[in-house]
Amino acid sequence: MKANPPLAWHPVPVSAPVNLRWWLMHQESLTRLLQAHCEHFRVEPVFQTLATACIDELEVMNLRRQNQVLVREVYLRCNETPVVFAHSIVKKEHLRGAWRGLSRLGNRSLGTMLFTNPLIQRTPLAFKKLKPHHPLFERACKQLQMRPINLWARRSLFILLRQPILVTEVFLPAIHQL
């Protein structure tokens, strides 16, 4: 049996802890789900710039290594505790098209926009256990007091007018307290 390459994302989070699987597999808006589970919810923007995509994002976004994308990263906080690190990328040229408002979201939820527009289509979720060498693991851990051994993430494409945005959500240890 052939081993999965280290960059692979999987259609099912088979080895994820049972109490995390429910969060990972939830198909609707993660923003709305978190809002229902905490008294105070907020989006904290931490990074937004034009950059190159992570190596495991290139194929799914049909990018070359040198292509510029808008990278937006935020923490989703429940009662001031970061519970999810969200990372989204969109091709630079699509910022003048379907995703033109993305660069001005600020502390507003991208999820709210994605799940209220009936023209946006979502691809199936993919899952990965992120290890410390993965760039998203490193960035997700910046505000954590203790670094975990690994972090589970999920991602999917949202497509508007044939223009995709890739949204990756990294679940932080505090999610278990909700």
UniProtKB/Swiss-Prot annotation:
Give the organism, scientific name: Nitrosomonas eutropha (strain DSM 101675 / C91 / Nm57)
Q: Which reaction does it catalyse?
A: chorismate = 4-hydroxybenzoate + pyruvate
Residue sites binding substrate per the record: R72, L110, E169
Q: What is its EC number?
A: 4.1.3.40
Q: What is the lineage of its organism?
A: Bacteria, Pseudomonadati, Pseudomonadota, Betaproteobacteria, Nitrosomonadales
- GO cellular component terms, A-Z: cytosol
Citing just one GO molecular function, the answer is:
chorismate lyase activity
**Cross-referenced InterPro entries:** Chorismate--pyruvate_lyase, Chorismate_lyase_/UTRA_dom_sf
Supply the name of the protein.
Answer: Probable chorismate pyruvate-lyase
User: Could you tell me the Gene Ontology terms of the biological process aspect for this record?
Assistant: pyruvate biosynthetic process; ubiquinone biosynthetic process
